[in-house]
């Protein structure tokens, strides 16, 4: 099934006229879940028993802090993706925008209007949930029309909007069916259609593809991109999947433990990660990390690992000089696709060779560091076996240098 992209642009095709665009501003937003009776002692004891989870819990005298110091300006018609591991606060943030969670502190503005205390129904937003949230006893048509009926929209207008949305999503043939007769992908289309007919200022999506299998998820991801161009509104999308974030977002907000780690375009967060967490979270396979030495010689910078030494690029040297970075021990990051098998360089032992079709993923051990090297099959001169010794190198232009003390990228 595909979105109906053969139609004329929506403005010419009778799209719902009321769809408007909006800016969204979140200013120093904080969310604390207060303790209920007896819960404070339990939470503190849990943190003491599991010290490795203290940061995730963020237990204070106020309660459990879910989101902190969250500030973001979302432009008109922008597609923003909130991404991060489970428990990072991304869904909580989305629910605060929707009005489903109270904001403990900070300001939320939609089109310049403060909406902290405005109920969800009056915020002019629509939300698509992970579990579809369809009424099982209603047909697809009735599900899509339900919110409009509650607003006492005339029947003729309801019919027009429902059929327009159904045509966009290519679900016209299912309008008389009930949800149980639909596949997961078709149900998700209905959930999206129900949001479209409301003509919202802001469209919110909370992990809408996570219940789908991998193949259908890939198809729906591409079609959400097409849909975004058709309805032309502001999107805030939540996911834990960095592939979804990279392919869908105009900008990505990467979160961890309730804090924003970095905001940027997909290219910015991939090529210039702000810290060790972002570097390891964005990109598949994950970035390789090494204990290394950063060496400054005048205005030149070199990195040295396992006896291999290379100079950083002029752009990186310029940024390090601006920050007056001195020689120090660092965590060095290099992506697998930027790591090359070579005649000389860092020595490593092959542990696993994964044939991926157009490339081989070599899993090697270099002085205790697990390293992945992506080798294009066109560059292979033979097969790699477990126990083989290989050497790898990398260019200074693709090396990322992180502080051992703070985990921050030293170029920032």
Where are these regions (language model features)?
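ABC ATPase nucleotide-binding domains
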Residues: 120-281
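Pre-Walker A (P-loop) beta-loop-beta motif of ABC nucleotide-binding domains
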Residues: 70-81
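The feature captures the beta-strand-to-loop junction immediately N-terminal to the Walker
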Residues: 83-85
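Non-catalytic connector elements of ABC transporters
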Residues: 2-3, 38, 287, 297-412
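Conserved ABC transporter NBD signature motif
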Residues: 106-114
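Helix-to-loop junction immediately C-terminal to a conserved catalytic motif
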Residues: 98
């Amino acid at each position: 099934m595909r979105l109906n992209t053969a139609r004329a642009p929506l403005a010419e095709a009778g799209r719902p006229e009321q769809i408007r665009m909006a800016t969204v501003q979140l200013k120093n937003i904080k969310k604390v879940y207060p303790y209920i009776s007896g819960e404070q002692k339990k939470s503190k004891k849990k943190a003491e028993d599991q010290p490795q989870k203290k940061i995730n819990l963020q237990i204070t005298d106020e309660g459990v802090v879910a989101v902190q110091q969250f500030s973001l300006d979302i432009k008109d018609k922008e597609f923003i993706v909130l991404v991060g591991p489970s428990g990072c606060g991304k869904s909580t943030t989305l629910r605060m925008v929707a009005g489903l969670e109270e904001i403990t502190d900070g300001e939320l503005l939609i089109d310049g209007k403060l909406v902290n205390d405005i109920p969800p129904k009056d915020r002019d937003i629509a939300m698509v949930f992970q579990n579809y949230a369809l009424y099982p006893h209603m047909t697809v048509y009735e599900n899509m029309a339900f919110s409009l009926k509650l607003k006492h929209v005339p029947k003729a207008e309801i019919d027009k909007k429902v059929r327009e949305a159904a045509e966009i999503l290519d679900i016209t043939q299912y309008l008389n069916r009930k949800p149980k007769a639909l596949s997961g992908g078709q149900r998700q289309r209905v959930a999206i259609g129900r949001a479209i007919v409301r003509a919202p200022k802001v469209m919110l999506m909370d992990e809408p593809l996570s219940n789908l299998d991998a193949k259908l998820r890939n198809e729906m991801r591409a079609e959400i991109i097409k849909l975004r161009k058709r309805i032309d509104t502001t999107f805030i999308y939540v996911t834990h999947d960095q592939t979804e974030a990279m392919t869908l977002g105009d900008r990505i907000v990467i979160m961890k433990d309730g804090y924003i780690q970095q905001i940027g375009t997909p290219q910015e967060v991939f090529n210039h990660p702000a810290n060790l967490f972002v570097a390891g979270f964005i990109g598949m396979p994950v970035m390789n990390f090494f204990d290394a030495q950063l060496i400054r010689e005048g205005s030149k910078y070199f990195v040295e690992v396992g006896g291999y030494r290379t100079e950083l690029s002029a752009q990186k040297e310029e940024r390090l000089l601006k920050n007056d970075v001195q020689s120090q021990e660092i965590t060095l990051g290099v992506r697998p696709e930027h790591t090359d098998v070579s005649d000389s360089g860092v020595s490593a032992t092959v542990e696993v060779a994964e044939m991926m079709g157009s490339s081989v993923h070599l899993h090697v051990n270099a002085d205790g560091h697990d390293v992945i090297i992506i080798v294009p099959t066109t560059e292979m001169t033979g097969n790699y076996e477990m126990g083989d010794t290989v050497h790898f190198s990398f260019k200074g232009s693709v090396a990322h240098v992180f502080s051992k003390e703070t985990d921050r990228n030293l170029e920032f």
